[in-house]
Amino acid sequence: TIFALSTNIKSSGSAIAVIRVSGDKTLNVIDEITNGKADGIREKPRQACLNDYVDPKTNELIDKGMTLWFPRPKSYTGEDLCEFHIHGSMAVINKMLSVLGNINDCRLAREGEFTRRALMNGKLHLIQAEGIRDLINARTENQRRRAL
């Protein structure tokens, strides 16, 4: 199971940051980071649920945020996937990433790994994956249009 910050954050932070998790242990990760209190997440896939995020080792509150769960195969990667929408301060982001990295069988994703998994699971074709890369890297209106 992998995780990564999906939002491009400036050094000063931002209002909101999104952290994605994908893989077989995604529901376990949700349970750990919410202390088993992600009420309704299984019954309401693709719907935002407000949760407290805690460090499972200390029970310390990290943040309150929105959790979205996308069960396989109907997710970007084709695997169970969730998004944690948190406040975008560097302190909150770094704490969440640190805590996720300490959860068993959960590791930081390599660059492009979510899209690679989508490609390998038949959710995207190579040309679509290249288009996503080009769109992410687009700096001009012309580059944006060509990527689409």
Q: Which residue ranges define each predicted feature?
A:
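A glycine-rich (often HGG/GG-containing) alpha/beta subdomain
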Residues: 1-146
